Amino acid sequence: GYRVGKSAHDAIEVTRKRCWQYPWVVEFDIKGLFDNIDHQLLMKALRKHCSTEWLLLYVERWLKVSIVMTGGEVQKREKGTPQGGVISPLLANLFLHYVFDKWAERELPGISFCRYADDGLLHCESLPQAEKILSMLDHRFKEVGLEIHPDKSHIVYCKHAKRQVKFNKTSFTFLGFDFRPRESKNSKGERYLNFSAGASDVAIKDMKAQIRWWNLPLRNDWSINEIANYINPVLRGWYQYYGRFYKTALKWVWRNLNQYLCRWVMRKYKRYSRHKAKASSYLARIAIAKRELFYHWKLGYVLTV
């Protein structure tokens, strides 16, 4: 994610374009990746990039360190990487580079794919091709001691205005974005069905939960400036990640936040305590006068007088 051209947004952008190009997607998730990595295969992959014997020795010892169970029982580790280990994600990515990436290049020529950690997508021309690839994936991962997650691995039809095949699954989630058919407008203002990415339902639910956790209505000892300083860094982060594609998906988050700010006004000022409409109008006037105060207000998500 820190390499140029390899960020999550790069992966989303590439996936969007491929979904427009290919009608079918095979999405897969590896079940318990970190617990099931084969040590011998991992060390073989590592030796392709490192010849320093003492370093290889330390990595191998670190992989095999015993686990102390809750009851004090010592259990030998025969596979997997230590939970929470700082280099576990790096080693897992190296492992999958050879187990999946190189395998796909060799065995699936011409098939576009994208993998981010243990989540991956392969784009197909037809349903029979997608079914064959899903079967090949299942066999490949079993070959190296891994298993694709049965509940998170599917074939998806990328439905839009020009694709009207009836299929039971027409959406998937990747890197916090839901890819699904959405209503869009063209340059003439005409509505049409498009297959695109937007903040996932799970991500929106999590953002709303964060807003609820802030308990803004109970912070009536704070000024509105203090609230803005407290939450703006988080709002900026949400928008910079999820607002990159289909910004409209975030409108429910911003509306939810405005409702909490309105409740804050009602708790802070007695004259508005039982008058939600008046509290909303008061907040709307502040938004007009100080559009820069809250990050989402700058984006145009303000209350109306």
Residue ranges and their predicted role:
Residues K64, V144-R219:
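A conserved non-catalytic segment of reverse transcriptases
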Residues E105, Y157-V165, H296, G300-T304:
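Flexible, glycine/threonine-enriched loop-and-boundary segments that flank and lead into catalytic domains
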Residues W24, D38-Q40, G72-Q75, Y116, ...:
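Short acidic (Asp/Glu) and glycine-rich catalytic loops that position anionic groups and cofactors
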Residues A8, N220, I224, Y246-L250:
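Residue-level recognition of alpha-helical structural elements
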Residues Y116, S153-A161, I231-V234, W252-N258, ...:
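A glycine-rich phosphate-binding loop feature that marks nucleotide/adenosyl-phosphate handling sites
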Residues I227-Y272:
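Non-catalytic, peripheral interaction segments enriched in hydrophobic/basic residues
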Residues N256, Y260, V265, Y269-V305:
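Extended C-terminal regions of large enzymes
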Residues G1-K159, S171:
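Conserved polymerase palm-domain catalytic core
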